[in-house]
């Protein structure tokens, strides 16, 4: 199976690199110290501190592996000046939900950076997919868990 390409903004790439560095240095050292201290408590078969530290170590190693793979296959989104008024990955788009008569603003990002509560939706989400390649004034319909919603693009900003 081919490895998936991860679309990232430059900001997202930098954040993931910073997290990886932190996990590989600071967190690994902290957890190794916890394991060392827990071993000092004696019998490992009934040592809750040791078990907890080993579980934490496994979680950190899993996250490190994920981040290394993500960064290996990352593609940084480049602003295309020829498409400055078209919604692309990396664009910040303000649209109106015509069903609710409510304006919303989100940045369209790759799945690895998606965080709707922080104003970032995935290009693979139903709304993200529906907005891609639209221009200011365009409308589209998107199927959501709550039913079909009509959206109208109000503004598009790059970067």
Swiss-Prot record:
Cite the entry's keywords alphabetically. Coiled coil, DNA-binding, Transcription, Transcription regulation
State the InterPro entries in the record: GreA/GreB_C_sf, TF_GreA/GreB_CS, Tscrpt_elong_fac_GreA, Tscrpt_elong_fac_GreA/B, Tscrpt_elong_fac_GreA/B_C, Tscrpt_elong_fac_GreA/B_fam, Tscrpt_elong_fac_GreA/B_N, Tscrpt_elong_fac_GreA/B_N_sf
Q: Name one Pfam family in it.
A: GreA_GreB_N
Q: Which residues form a coiled coil?
A: 10-75
- Give any single GO term for biological process: regulation of DNA-templated transcription elongation
Q: Which Gene3D superfamilies match?
A: Transcription elongation factor, GreA/GreB, C-terminal domain, Transcription elongation factor, GreA/GreB, N-terminal domain
GO molecular function terms listed in the Swiss-Prot or TrEMBL record: DNA binding; RNA polymerase binding
Family of the protein in this entry: Belongs to the GreA/GreB family.
What PANTHER family has UniProt attached to this entry? TRANSCRIPTION ELONGATION FACTOR GREA
**Function per UniProt:** Necessary for efficient RNA polymerase transcription elongation past template-encoded arresting sites. The arresting sites in DNA have the property of trapping a certain fraction of elongating RNA polymerases that pass through, resulting in locked ternary complexes. Cleavage of the nascent transcript by cleavage factors such as GreA or GreB allows the resumption of elongation from the new 3'terminus. GreA releases sequences of 2 to 3 nucleotides.
Q: What is this protein called?
A: Transcription elongation factor GreA
Give the gene name: greA
